[in-house]
Each structure stands twice: as structure tokens, then as C-alpha cells.
Amino acid sequence: MTESLPDFEDLPLDRDAKILDHHPSGLVAIDKPVGVLTHPNRKDEKKARTLLRADYDFQEERYTWVDDAGGKRSLHLVHRLDSPTSGVLLATFSAELAVSLRKSFAARETHKTYYAIVREKGKARDGHWKDRLDEVREDGKLRVKAGRGHEALAKVTFERRRVGRLGLSLIRLEPITGRTHQLRVQASTRGFPIVGDRIYGDFALNRKIARASRVERLCLHATSIELDFKYQGNPIKFYAESPLPRIMGKLLS
């Protein structure tokens, strides 16, 4: 999409975030960097890096700021990514569109693709992962475990197996549901801990890889999102893609 809109020019993005694509409806796809919060935590320190350098309204799920001309601006989040996960994140200047797209996400009408680098300990097999996940609090921190809670569904494809000097594998994950920490837990419980996962991963492996390659990040990247919506009465198909980070590709060489 080549149209340039003034609304997109002065977004107070984090220094490493960038716009991947946008649409005249106000929809924008942002490449969220690793370690950056989608939005600030309610009790978070001011120093934490967030997607936008702006105030956040938790009730409305939007960032607000004043532009250079003195105008009040806002950007509504459509969905979220965990802080250690990088990749495609959708937001919009339209409150109405935000509500509509959030419903599309809840109704499983969007197609999302992630890539993860894992160590194979389980039996590698393409197919679908189906679980029930429980959210619990441990020492005041949110943790997710297999249990009897919300249904979690994802399609998995083993793209590259035991490659490079570290013998790691690249898997493509297509979540059908969007539960908290879903992909990280589903991979870990099946014997495929994601490299760099400090909660559900293989901590000894993480240390080994950090020493060998200096890669310490969670190797989970939201590669693409595809969705349909209507704009001015016309059906729109929107697709945004973020390439695999170079530092992750380095682990596969």
C-alpha cells in the first residue's frame, strides 16, 4: 500500500519499532521489538519501554498523546504480544474499527503465523496441538500450566530440523486461539522448549546458547497476520509480514 497518510507520520513509536504497513481505514501494522511492552503494566515503572512513548488508557485500550500541532491523538490496540515476543502487532486510529477487529480476533477469524526456534526433545510431528490451559499466580507472577481451563489450539509445522552447529529446529506455529503464553507452554510441555524462554524453557540450554552465540532473547516471532474487514462498504483483505529477525536466523546457521 503506497498511500501516505498524515496520521501515520508522527506516531511516537519506541525507537526500534517501525511501521510495516497501513490502510486508509486507520489500521496500522507495527513491528514490535523484543523486550518492548505492548502497553505499560498498571504498576509498571516509568522507565519500561512501551510500544508508544505516550500515555495509556487501560479502559479504552488506547494510547493518547498531543501532536506537534496541539491536536489530541489516540491509537487503539487490536491485540497484544508478550514483551519478549517480537513481530507484527495491529493497532488503529479508529475506535469503531478497533472494536470490530477485536471481535474478529475473539471469533478466530484472523490468521496468525509465528516462528520459533526450539530444541527437539519430543517426537517431532506436524499437526495440531490441543490443550486446556490454567492461569495461576506464583509469587505474584502470572504463570500458565496445562490443566482444565481455556481451550488452546494451534497448528504446528516443523520447517527445519536439527540444523546448524547448535542442532536447533525451526517450527511454524499458527495459533487458532490466542491464550496467554499459549505457544510457549504448548511447545514446552511437548518437549520443544523455545530457545530463550526464561519461564517455560530449558534454562541450561538457554545458558549454553547464550555462551555460544550471545543470543539471550526469546526466539518466538510473530511473522504475519492476515484478516478481512469492511471499509466504506467494501471488503478488505489486509496482510502484514515481519521477516525473521537476523539474530534468530543466526542460530540456524
Which residue stretches match the model-derived regions?
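RNA pseudouridine synthases
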Residues: 1-253
